[in-house]
Amino acid sequence: MLAKRIIPCLDVTLDESEARVVKGVEFVNLRDAGDPVELAKRYDEEGADELVFLDITASPEGRRTMIDVIERTAEQVFIPFTVGGGIKSIEDINTILSAGADKVSINTAAVKNPEFVREAADIFGSQCIVVAIDCRRNFDLSKGEYIVELEDGTKAWYEVVIYGGRKPVGIDAVWWAKRVEELGAGEILLTSMNRDGTKDGFDIPITRKISEEVNIPVIASGGAGTKEHFYEGFVEGKADACLAASIFHYREIGIREIKEYLAERGVQVRL
C-alpha cells in the first residue's frame, strides 16, 4: 500500500506586485499568511510529502500565474510541487513545468474544454496533470446524477463550481471525476466548498464516493482542523492524500505531529 500523503496548500494572491499566501473561509474573507517561498521552505523541512501552490486570483482575473514565485519556490523545495490557477493552454503548462513545478492543476479550463485534459495528458503525461474539482452540495435531487447520503442521513448531489467557487455549472462532481480520469488526468484534487476553511473536517461523503468511483489518486481538500480529521479523510474518506492550508500556515498543528498520530493509528505515512 502506498503511503498516505500530507500536502500543505499555498493559496497565493498578488498584493501590490508582491506575492502573499492568503487563507479564507469558503474562498472569501482572505487573510494574509505570509511569503510563499518562506512557507514552502518551512513545509519541506517539516516533512510535507508534496506542496500545492494555487494562484487563486489567476482564474477570476485572467492573470497568468506568477512564474517568478514558482521559480524561487522550486529552488528552495525538494518535494513534488503542483501549481494551479489560471492555466488555460498547453503553453501555460509548459511554462509552469519549465519553471520548476512537477505537476499542474487544471480546474476552470478543464470544465470549459474537457479535451484540454486529454491534450495535456498526451503531451506531458498523466502524472503531470491534476484536475481540481471544486464542488458544493445541491439538495435539488432531480438535477443530480450521483446522489450521496450525508452524515445526518439527508441526501444531496455535489455540483461542480468554477472560477474559485463562484459559478455553479450544473455538472455532477462524481460524473466529472470519472470523466477526467477517462480523459487522462493522473490525480484529482477535490475541494468541498461546504467545508473549505471551516475546520469542521473533510467532506467525507463526497470524498469517499469519488475515491470509490475512480482508480486515480484523490486528494481531499477543505475543512481540516484537527489530527483526527486527517485520519477520517484517509480511513473513512478513502483519500490518497489530505490537503490543508490554514492549520499549517498559522502553526495550529505541525505536519510531523499529524504524521506521528496517523502512524500510531495504523495509517501508513512517510515519517
From Swiss-Prot:
The answer to whether UniProt assigns keyword Amino-acid biosynthesis to this entry is: yes
Q: What's the protein name?
A: Imidazole glycerol phosphate synthase subunit HisF
Keywords associated with the record = Amino-acid biosynthesis, Cytoplasm, Histidine biosynthesis, Lyase
Nucleus: present as a keyword of the record?
A: no
Q: What EC designation does it have?
A: 4.3.2.10
Q: Name one GO cellular component term.
A: cytoplasm
What cystine pairs are annotated?
Answer: none
**Which Gene Ontology MF annotations are present?**
imidazoleglycerol-phosphate synthase activity; lyase activity
- Similarity section: Belongs to the HisA/HisF family.
Question: InterPro entries in the record, alphabetically?
Answer: Aldolase_TIM, His_biosynth, HisF, IGPS_HisA/HisF, RibuloseP-bd_barrel
Question: Reaction catalysed?
Answer: 5-[(5-phospho-1-deoxy-D-ribulos-1-ylimino)methylamino]-1-(5-phospho-beta-D-ribosyl)imidazole-4-carboxamide + L-glutamine = D-erythro-1-(imidazol-4-yl)glycerol 3-phosphate + 5-amino-1-(5-phospho-beta-D-ribosyl)imidazole-4-carboxamide + L-glutamate + H(+)
Name its cellular compartments: Cytoplasm
What are the GO BP annotations of this UniProt entry? L-histidine biosynthetic process
Q: What gene does the UniProt entry assign to this protein?
A: hisF
